[in-house]
A protein has these predicted regions:
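Acidic, glycine/proline-rich low-complexity segments that act as flexible tails and inter-domain linkers
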Residues: 2-12
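Short, basic, glycine/proline-bearing loop/turn elements
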Residues: 55-59, 97-99
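Short internal beta-strands
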Residues: 39, 50-56, 83-89
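Aromatic- and Gly/Pro-rich donor/ligand-binding loops
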Residues: 124-126
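Short, glycine-rich nucleotide/cofactor-binding loops
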Residues: 15, 20-35, 58-64
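A short aromatic-anchored loop/beta-hairpin motif
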Residues: 74-76, 100-114, 121-122
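A glycine-rich helix N-cap at a beta->alpha junction
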Residues: 67-96
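Histidine-anchored nucleotide/phosphate-binding helix
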Residues: 31-45
Length: 126
C-alpha cells in the first residue's frame, strides 16, 4: 500500500488531482479556520488541479447570513474554485437566492457527488 505521507512531490503527481470539499457544518469557526482556508489554499497553491466546494445543509444558512464568509467564497470563485450547493437544503432553509447571487451553482447534488466519489476525487467533509 502506498503511503502518501512518505511520497515525494513527483510521485504524488500520479495520484488524483481533484478535490471535492463537502461543507456541511454551520459552525463559523469551522468555516473560517478550516474549511474555506484549506479549500482556497488548495486551489491557489496548485495542490490540486480541480477544487470543488459543495455547500450543503446548515452551511447554506451560515453563508447566506455572513458577509465576511461571502467575501471569502467570492474570492475562492475568482481564483478558480468550483462553487456548488445542494438546492434541497438551500430551499428548505430559504437561502437559495442568496447563494445564487454569490455565483454558486445551486442544484441537486446527489448525482454530482456520486460522480465525484466514483471518479476518485479526494473528498473532505467539514
Amino acid at each position: 500500500m502506498v503511503n502518501p505521507l512518505t511520497m515525494k512531490a513527483e510521485e504524488l503527481k500520479d495520484q488524483t488531482e481533484k478535490l471535492a470539499v463537502l461543507w456541511v457544518s454551520g459552525d463559523r469557526d469551522v468555516a473560517e479556520k478550516s474549511c474555506l482556508m484549506y479549500t482556497h489554499a488548495a486551489k491557489r497553491n496548485g495542490w490540486f488541479d480541480e477544487v470543488v466546494l459543495i455547500v450543503w445543509g446548515s452551511s447554506s444558512r451560515l453563508l447566506a447570513e455572513d458577509e465576511a464568509l461571502q467575501e471569502k467564497v467570492r474570492a475562492m470563485g475568482k481564483d478558480g474554485v468550483i462553487l456548488e450547493a445542494y438546492i434541497a437544503c438551500s430551499d428548505q432553509l430559504g437561502v437559495t437566492e442568496e447563494l445564487l447571487e454569490l455565483g454558486i451553482d445551486v442544484k441537486g447534488m446527489g448525482v454530482p457527488l456520486t460522480t465525484y466519489l466514483k471518479e476518485g476525487y479526494h473528498v473532505l467533509t467539514y
